[in-house]
Amino acid sequence: MLSFDEALSRLLSGARQVNEIRSLPTLAAAGRVLAETQYATLSVPPLDNSAMDGYAVRVADLSTIGSCLPVTQRIPAGSIGTTLLPGSAARIFTGAPIPPGADAVVMQELCEHGEGGVVINHLPHAGENIRRAGSDVSAGSSILAVGQRLRPQDTALAASVGIARLPVFRRVRVAVFFTGDELRMPGAALPPGAIYNSNRFLLTALLEGLGCEVRDLGQVPDNLEATRAALREATHDNDLILTSGGVSVGEEDYVKPAVEAEGRLDMWRIAIKPGKPLAFGQVKVKMDPAGREVAFIGLPGNPVSSFVTFLMLVRPFILRMQGVQATAPLAYALRADFDWLHSDVRREFLRARLNANGGVELFENQGSGVLTSAVWAGGLVDNAPQQVIRRGDTVRFLPFSELLG
């Protein structure tokens, strides 16, 4: 068996990045992967401006609390005032540029109307309540790096410096199909021995959450020719083929021989629990003069095995195809509020969640077919091979918030 780290390394080295670039309106770019580093074309804020509603003043004019200054101008956001003369104040609002001559803003709560002006009940220091030009972003600075998945705050930052369109990589196109004559779709009758196809919903949603363009080829009969035909169809205009089920070594598992007939299989068994049977290879595109191949990953059929292997192996593979530079999930070192004394030669990913005491608790049944464990959990405990865990130990916790998307 391959170790988890070796399997992941091989997967990532075999991921071919999608280099086609699309130009999208910044408003539509969230969730996509940036194709070119972006630089600020202007400073933010472009001018010194007021951090709050109040009065712009000259500090030198305020020697005592209670000074009364005439208000000579009103400066709302979006307008520019004139030079503030000595011995006067300007009514100013949040975001409005500081008028020349002023060197502080006194918040309106510290002021009151007086006869002939405004009474300043505070002695400000120079620069008080002033946001300096370029304090957020300096013109010419790098604001967004190539290879990062754009979040709402990223597109907002781009918009703040006037970037109307962003270059992003084309979505990764993934064809999926599912094997197993026992599978039925929800809503259909369920004869004895049949089960509903939960993996179809699981994997489609996981792929869409990663921003993939999903082509669902549906259910494939459990025989070699049907599986080979599905593989050939899946190569058409796709970057990755993903299957669920049929990757074991049983007589009724046809994905492995089908991939070997239509291409090549590079690895097969991984020391991971759940999810030991996993196939990775390439499927040849028929009649392609360039000899193009499409990456293939076959996941195990058990729902939790499929879920965990997707998160820990397929997700970083797809991120690398998308051009994302950082593929490793953020992990937290937390206290175990459980005992796990069943050491295994494989690397284990245990369904767990945080409790109210700041520790991690474990779902009681860690079986690979127990989908309720993934629903109950808030993440995975990454447990090294042959490692037992005792209450109070520090464990490596991977929250689903880092893994889903």
Residue ranges and their predicted role:
Residues 2, 13-15, 55-216, 233, ...:
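Short, glycine/charged-enriched hinge/interface segments at domain edges or termini
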Residues 22-27, 36, 137, 260-405:
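Flexible glycine/proline-rich
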Residues 1-66, 325-349:
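Short, low-complexity N-terminal leaders and the immediately following helix N-cap/first helix
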Residues 22-26, 44-69, 101-116, 350-374:
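Short beta-strand/loop turn elements enriched in aromatics
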Residues 9-20, 35-39, 135, 142-155, ...:
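Generic secondary-structure signature for well-ordered alpha-helical cores
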Residues 4, 164-299, 303-309:
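Helix-rich terminal scaffold detector
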Residues 1-8, 22, 26, 48, ...:
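Generic structural signal for well-ordered, non-membrane alpha-helical segments
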